[in-house]
Amino acid sequence: MKKLFKLLAFFCAVCICVTMFQPVQGQAATKPSKKKITVSYKKFADGVVVTYKNKNKCAVKLTAKLSFKDAAGTVISKEKEINNCLGASRKVAIYFKAPVDSYGNTVPFVSYKHSFSIAKSKFKDYSKKIYITKDAQAAQAAFTAINLSDKNLSKIQATIVFHDSTGAIVYSCMKYLNCYAPNQNMLFNVEYQELMIRPEKIDVYINYAY
């Protein structure tokens, strides 16, 4: 009987040690990696459009910073944007607007410096459920956004990028959408006189919806 108790005690001790030193599964896999965010840049007269593709398996909070510099390398403006819910496998665009003078004219810039950081988002991503249709009319581009999710959302943002016939960016803007309720839609438009040219191509990115 004493031998049996000793064997049971030894077995329990082994089980406790194995449990204590066994690695916790899944924790490392859920931590997003900055290396899985691919970034591309397109500079134009009024600023820089930066696109981000999240190749992580979870939504991330993206904090992006961009500094504009003049010909001497002096920083003339610093911009910061936060995307609280960049969904897994989603591609978004952030428009960093160049600084303007007291008359509202864009201050010329020569170069820029960009940096970003990420963390796991605390929100659930519904950006795939926001659909936008576009209609390039004679004097304006008309858009209709609709929430096809079954949730009441609180934050929705889109970036719209306009290109000329060569593919160069001629204008960009970010819009906050208010189609928060299920099946709710929102109509909005962009006048071509803001662009100074009729665009040949329009790209729409849903930056976040949560």
Set out the residue ranges of the language-model regions.
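Bacterial N-terminal signal peptides that target proteins for export
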Residues: 1-11
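Asparagine-centered strand-capping/turn motif at beta-strand->loop junctions
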Residues: 52-56, 145-150
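Terminal connector regions
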Residues: 32-35, 43, 98-140, 189-210
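Bacterial N-terminal signal peptides
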Residues: 10-19
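Intrinsically disordered, low-complexity Pro/Gly/Ser/Thr-rich segments with frequent PxxP/GP/PP motifs
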Residues: 74-103, 170-196
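Sec-dependent signal peptide cleavage junction
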Residues: 18-32
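Short acidic/proline- and small/hydrophobic-mixed sequence motifs that coincide with surface turns
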Residues: 57-62, 76, 150-155, 169-170
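Beta-strand signatures of extracellular beta-sandwich domains
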Residues: 63-69, 157-163
